[in-house]
Amino acid sequence: MAIVIVAFVVFLDQFTKYLAAKYLMPIGSYPVIKHFFHLTYVENRGAAFGMLQNKTLFFIVITVVVGIVLIYSMIKLPENSLYNYTLAMILGGAIGNLIDRVRLGYVVDFIDFKFFPAVFNVADSFIVVGAIILGYLMIFKGGIR
């Protein structure tokens, strides 16, 4: 099941980025709910909040190392554990952004909540939600088993 989650996250991420590039790049931004939620095309050459701009090789190396650690952890965990599914969400997001960095030299972002200081993408969402769930499990459910 974990491999299905990884594949789903990568597919959803890459498909939505394709749509963003095709439809948003020419117009820049589309207000879905004016002053609250926009779809805004951004080529992110750094990390969150614009940190470490133009460090593509650095991000590729870090992502590969983290990916290896995630895969190793997933192999060691029971196949059907919530921990495994959570790591699969994070791995899928990491792979989605890695594909962009290798293929394009930047990550396509497009989800733009006007009250939040950064534009992000589906991969980022799965990484953050996966990390929050993992943190919860580790703190309140007694660590990784």
From Swiss-Prot:
Membrane topology of the entry: Multi-pass membrane protein
Report the Pfam families cross-referenced here: Peptidase_A8 (PF01252)
Gene Ontology CC annotations of this record? plasma membrane
- Catalytic residues at 109, 124
List UniProt keywords, sorted A-Z: Aspartyl protease, Cell membrane, Hydrolase, Membrane, Protease, Transmembrane, Transmembrane helix
What catalytic activity is recorded?
Answer: Release of signal peptides from bacterial membrane prolipoproteins. Hydrolyzes -Xaa-Yaa-Zaa-|-(S,diacylglyceryl)Cys-, in which Xaa is hydrophobic (preferably Leu), and Yaa (Ala or Ser) and Zaa (Gly or Ala) have small, neutral side chains
Asked whether the keyword Mitochondrion is assigned, the reply is: no
Q: Main EC class of this protein? A: hydrolase
Q: Where in the cell is it found?
A: Cell membrane
Please report which protein family the annotation says this sequence is part of.
Belongs to the peptidase A8 family.
PANTHER family per the UniProt record, alphabetical: LIPOPROTEIN SIGNAL PEPTIDASE (PTHR33695:SF1)
Q: What does this protein do?
A: This protein specifically catalyzes the removal of signal peptides from prolipoproteins.
Q: What is this protein called?
A: Lipoprotein signal peptidase
